[in-house]
C-alpha cells in the first residue's frame, strides 16, 4: 500500500494557510484518477468528487463577494468571476502554492508537465482542495482560503483588464494602437473528424503576428490571439 507520512504535508499546509484535521482529505484532493490505475490498493478515492464540491463552493463565495462589494451590472460581474475561476488562473495559483510535487498521478501524467492537460489537472486540484477544506473545516475555512489565494488577485485582474477574452483584447488594442482590425485564417487542419486539430494564424493586414492551435477553430483563434498579445507585448503575465 502506498502511504505518505503526514509530516510531509506541513510545508504545503503552511502555504495553503490551512491545517487539515483529517490528512486523508488532503491526500484525496491531490489524487488524480490516473494514479489509481497504477495503485489499485491505494486507500483513497481520486479527487473528482471533491473537485465537484469545490467548484460549487468557489463559485458561490466569489459570486457573493462580487455581489456585495461591486454595484456593476451582472454581465461585468460574470466576466470578472470567469477571470477569477478559470483553469488558467487556478493553475497559476496552484503553481504559486507549489503543490505540483504533491500531486499523485500516473507515471505518464507526471512526465507530461507542459501540456494543456496538466493545466487542467492543477486547476481541478485547487477546486478539490477547496472542497476538502470545506468538508474538513467548514464554510468559513473555505471562504478564508478563497479570499487569501483567489479573491486577492481581483485588483490585478481589474487593473490589467484580464477579464476581457484574448480575442476581444487583441482586437481592441490593435484598433486603438494601429487602427487595424485583426483577421484570422486557418493555416492547417489535421486529424480525423472526431479529433480535429486546427492551427490558426492571426494577421494584422498581411503580417502574420502569431499562430495558435486547438480542437476547434474558436479555441485555435483564442490561442492565436493570446499568442499575439504576448508577441506584441500587449499582455500581462499572471506570474
Task: Please state what every model-predicted region is.
Residues 1-239:
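Double-stranded RNA-binding/processing signature
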Amino acid at each position: 500500500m502506498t502511504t505518505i507520512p503526514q509530516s510531509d504535508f506541513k510545508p504545503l499546509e503552511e502555504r495553503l494557510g490551512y491545517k487539515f484535521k483529517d490528512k486523508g482529505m488532503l491526500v484525496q484532493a491531490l489524487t488524480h484518477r490516473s494514479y489509481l490505475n497504477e495503485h489499485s490498493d491505494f486507500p483513497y478515492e481520486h479527487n473528482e468528487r471533491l473537485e465537484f464540491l469545490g467548484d460549487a463552493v468557489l463559485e458561490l463565495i466569489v459570486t457573493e463577494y462580487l455581489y456585495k462589494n461591486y454595484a456593476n451590472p451582472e454581465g461585468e460581474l460574470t466576466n470578472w468571476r470567469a477571470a477569477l475561476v478559470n483553469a488558467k488562473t487556478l493553475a497559476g495559483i496552484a503553481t504559486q502554492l507549489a503543490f505540483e510535487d504533491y500531486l499523485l498521478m500516473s507515471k505518464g501524467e507526471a512526465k507530461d508537465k507542459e501540456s494543456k492537460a496538466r493545466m487542467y489537472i492543477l486547476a481541478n486540484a485547487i477546486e478539490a482542495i477547496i472542497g476538502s477544506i470545506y468538508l474538513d473545516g467548514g464554510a468559513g475555512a473555505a471562504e478564508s482560503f478563497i479570499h487569501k489565494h483567489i479573491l486577492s488577485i481581483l485588483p490585478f485582474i481589474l487593473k490589467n483588464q484580464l477579464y476581457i477574452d484574448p480575442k476581444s483584447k487583441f482586437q481592441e488594442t490593435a484598433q486603438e494602437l494601429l487602427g487595424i482590425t485583426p483577421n484570422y485564417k486557418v493555416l492547417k487542419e489535421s486529424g480525423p473528424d472526431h479529433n480535429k486539430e486546427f492551427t490558426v494564424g492571426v494577421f494584422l493586414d498581411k503580417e502574420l503576428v502569431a499562430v495558435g492551435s486547438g480542437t476547434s477553430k474558436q479555441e485555435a483563434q483564442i490561442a492565436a490571439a493570446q499568442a499575439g498579445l504576448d508577441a506584441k507585448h500587449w499582455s500581462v503575465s499572471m506570474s
